Amino acid sequence: MQLLLGRRPYARIAFLDDVSRRYRERYGSSYHDDVFSVHQALGLGAETGAACVYASITPLKEKEIIINFKTDASRDSDLQNHLFKILRCLIDECGVYSFNMSMHPFNAEMEIPGIIRIIDRGNIASASSDMGGMELFGSSVIGSDPYITFNRIKGALDA
């Protein structure tokens, strides 16, 4: 497990916050709410309690699931329960054995919500399926269908 902590947001989070602020100034709405609405309209997103869950149509890597929330994750038992169900679903029903998960906590001073991102690292027995140069420097290589992944996640959340 890797854990990174800091007093200031890391570069990608700071960039996302800046983009989100400019988006609100230009369009008068939340970038993250609008992205979620597009995913929901495509059948890839669901609101569950105070969180929005969706399977990305532009995943960084296989089976990318994004959870946006505006609560204190350490005290939100519903969010914790949903995260548990999603992880169990990915492991038990989607065959995910190696994954990365990042969590940016909600900070009311920032434009962005709390964000949890989960990606499948691929078959642990295959060196070619893990993250590599193509994903980092070129384009993402995606072989999974987000509709199949999200239908399983939705079923787990509804259980």
Residue ranges, per PLM feature:
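HIT superfamily nucleotide-processing domains
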Residues: M1-A159
